[in-house]
Amino acid sequence: MSSRYRVEYHLKSHRKDEFIDWVKGLLASPFVLHAVSHEGDYNDDLATTQRVRSQYADIFKDIEGLIKDKIEFDSRNMSQDEIEDGASSQSLNILGQSRLNLLVPSIGTFFTELPLEQAFLWEDSQRAISARRMVAPSFNDIRHILNTAQIFHFKKQENLHNGKVLRLVTFDGDVTLYEDGGSLVYTNPVIPYILKLLRCGINVGIVTAAGYDEAGTYENRLKGLIVALHDSTDIPVSQKQNLTIMGGESSYLFRYYEDPEEDNFGFRQIDKEEWLLPRMKAWSLEDVEKTLDFAERTLNRLRKRLNLPSEISIIRKVRAVGIVPGERYDEASKRQVPVKLDREQLEEIVLTLQNTLESFAPSRRIQFSCFDGGSDVWCDIGGKDLGVRSLQQFYNPESPIQPSETLHVGDQFAPVGSANDFKARLAGCTLWIASPQETVNYLHRLLETD
């Protein structure tokens, strides 16, 4: 489900982010205590705003300390190899649990410290959070504060002598780089920022659920980007080649190339032996096929049970299976009209598919990802965490890029079932955005010179 669907968001437990909800709860007390009107007395109102700002800032400072303690605790509790293999602090309790784990049991791994107090004060200056009396700090407020803190961290690392600078930025496609179902046209405002990342020597990967085993489809959807990259004379070809596409979440890898003699450019597929992680190579083809067969049967049963229109079709690919909307001819308008799935139908399908596959033996021996794309539902073999980890290894096999040097930008981070960017949190730092314009705004702040 793309981030634009926010109606009744907080009524659905599978759509909640427990950490953000916990932060909202902490901020509720100062909001309620100071949610008073001063009947037009500007000085009293200003004093109240300052008190609220100070209390909010203190809360974020305390959370900042809890995150720092958790990072130190986790570093003692697990080795780097265990982190790379996908182990979480929830599964390793050699030394018990950090205080933040006890307060928020579902909390994941933090790869960097987050200057939350500084981020709050910056966001407050832009959004006047402390000045509000009727609307408490919201999910979106906290999402923006977390994103800004991550940006501030990487900006700080640039100025440190031995800082862990950013080496890899990965992006989702739909709703992150372009509108849902769209493409990256030449006029897209995100393109200059992607070029600047490459110009700065930062690797760029587009990790998308769209799975195709040939380059043409990706070249068409990203035409504006690759034309702009080809036309950029101030970026060496060696750095242009640091643009990659990971398709099907972790199934197909393509790398940008230029052939000056033939004046050709585009994407070239990379042989799987060059980038597959050892754990992915260990998956049996039989388990993959059985998982997709089982998922396809489940989708067929759901189509009958939910009495879906015949135009709704099920598509089977080599590494994925999904249920997608269709079209029918409308006699009144004399044209084809879309036949869509309702939001409730999409959620029923993705949650049922996820739960049934979790109890299916072959699918437990591999990794799969079920997600709701806003108009369709898919089950992919692999996941975005593996896609990001594969890129970390591919760009520098001798010295793989670390999670603390990686930033994934995406719009689907709901914690259960319906969001495929969520798993990317296992492989690196993240920015949770809600529109392509937000992506542009954050990249501008990341790349602007102080």
Curated annotation (Swiss-Prot):
<dbReference type="GO" id="GO:0009117">
    <property type="term" value="P:nucleotide metabolic process"/>
</dbReference>
<keyword id="KW-0479">Metal-binding</keyword>
<dbReference type="GO" id="GO:0000287">
    <property type="term" value="F:magnesium ion binding"/>
</dbReference>
<keyword id="KW-0547">Nucleotide-binding</keyword>
<comment type="similarity">
    <text>Belongs to the ISN1 family.</text>
</comment>
<feature type="binding site">
    <location>
        <position position="376"/>
    </location>
    <ligand>
        <name>IMP</name>
    </ligand>
</feature>
<keyword id="KW-0460">Magnesium</keyword>
<feature type="binding site">
    <location>
        <position position="174"/>
    </location>
    <ligand>
        <name>IMP</name>
    </ligand>
</feature>
<keyword id="KW-0378">Hydrolase</keyword>
<feature type="binding site">
    <location>
        <position position="208"/>
    </location>
    <ligand>
        <name>IMP</name>
    </ligand>
</feature>
<feature type="active site" description="Nucleophile">
    <location>
        <position position="172"/>
    </location>
</feature>
<keyword id="KW-0067">ATP-binding</keyword>
<feature type="binding site">
    <location>
        <position position="180"/>
    </location>
    <ligand>
        <name>IMP</name>
    </ligand>
</feature>
<dbReference type="GO" id="GO:0005524">
    <property type="term" value="F:ATP binding"/>
</dbReference>
<protein>
    <recommendedName>
        <fullName>IMP-specific 5'-nucleotidase 1</fullName>
        <ecNumber>3.1.3.99</ecNumber>
    </recommendedName>
</protein>
<dbReference type="GO" id="GO:0050483">
    <property type="term" value="F:IMP 5'-nucleotidase activity"/>
</dbReference>
<dbReference type="GO" id="GO:0006190">
    <property type="term" value="P:inosine salvage"/>
</dbReference>
<feature type="binding site">
    <location>
        <position position="144"/>
    </location>
    <ligand>
        <name>ATP</name>
    </ligand>
</feature>
<dbReference type="GO" id="GO:0071592">
    <property type="term" value="P:nicotinic acid riboside biosynthetic process"/>
</dbReference>
<dbReference type="GO" id="GO:0071590">
    <property type="term" value="P:nicotinamide riboside biosynthetic process"/>
</dbReference>
<feature type="binding site">
    <location>
        <position position="172"/>
    </location>
    <ligand>
        <name>Mg(2+)</name>
    </ligand>
</feature>
<comment type="function">
    <text>IMP-specific 5'-nucleotidase involved in IMP (inosine 5'-phosphate) degradation.</text>
</comment>
<feature type="binding site">
    <location>
        <position position="411"/>
    </location>
    <ligand>
        <name>Mg(2+)</name>
    </ligand>
</feature>
<comment type="subunit">
    <text>Homotetramer.</text>
</comment>
<feature type="binding site">
    <location>
        <position position="172"/>
    </location>
    <ligand>
        <name>IMP</name>
    </ligand>
</feature>
<dbReference type="InterPro" id="IPR009453">
    <property type="entry name" value="ISN1"/>
</dbReference>
<feature type="active site" description="Proton donor">
    <location>
        <position position="174"/>
    </location>
</feature>
<dbReference type="InterPro" id="IPR036412">
    <property type="entry name" value="HAD-like_sf"/>
</dbReference>
<feature type="binding site">
    <location>
        <position position="384"/>
    </location>
    <ligand>
        <name>IMP</name>
    </ligand>
</feature>
<dbReference type="Pfam" id="PF06437">
    <property type="entry name" value="ISN1"/>
</dbReference>
<keyword id="KW-0546">Nucleotide metabolism</keyword>
<feature type="binding site">
    <location>
        <position position="174"/>
    </location>
    <ligand>
        <name>Mg(2+)</name>
    </ligand>
</feature>
